[in-house]
């Protein structure tokens, strides 16, 4: 009984379909790991199993559109209430409030992961593990989808379960060091 397993797939679409199934059904049902505790990693942003493609597939499967669920387009991405997102720039001046208390502070940092709790007009409210931040439209470039993130962005983070999409990355990224 090992908690590590390797699944070979012939092409990137088969790999993406398998990753979606692992997150949506197999790991939650067989290992009791909820989808929100599974992090998908990829060595690259582009290509079939890059984070851009994986994030679109995972959002469609794990957080599809629904009536009453707020959405906000930014560039090529549609942010949706319930999405997992990552702060991708240090912002020492952003105000956060601790959920359920009157505590507040300043600063969110590159690599912080949260969940969009609400989208009200142009404002997106994100919960970073109890620290709630409101993003105005001019701040949305500080957020990226985080259902899947690059191995580089995940360095130093801990997750209950990790799925590594290592199929079609650039040769210099497809090394043992990526697993480390």
What spans do the regions from the language model cover?
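Conserved helicase motor core of P-loop NTPases
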Residues: 1-106
């Amino acid at each position: 009984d090992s908690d590590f397993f390797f699944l070979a797939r012939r092409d990137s679409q088969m790999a993406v379909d398998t990753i979606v199934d692992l997150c949506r059904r197999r790991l939650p049902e067989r290992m009791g790991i909820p989808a929100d505790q599974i992090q998908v990693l990829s060595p690259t942003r582009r290509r079939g199993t890059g984070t851009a493609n994986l994030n679109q597939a995972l959002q469609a499967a794990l957080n599809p559109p629904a009536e009453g669920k707020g959405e906000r387009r930014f560039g090529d991405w549609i942010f949706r209430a319930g999405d997992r997102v990552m702060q991708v720039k240090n912002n020492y001046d952003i105000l956060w409030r601790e959920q359920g208390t009157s505590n507040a502070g300043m600063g969110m940092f590159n690599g912080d992961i949260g969940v969009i709790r609400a989208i009200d007009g142009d404002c997106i409210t994100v919960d970073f593990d109890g620290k709630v931040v409101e993003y105005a439209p001019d701040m949305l470039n500080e957020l990226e989808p985080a259902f899947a993130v690059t191995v580089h962005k995940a360095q130093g983070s801990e997750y209950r379960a990790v799925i590594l999409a290592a199929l079609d990355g650039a040769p210099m990224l497809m090394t043992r060091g990526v697993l480390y």
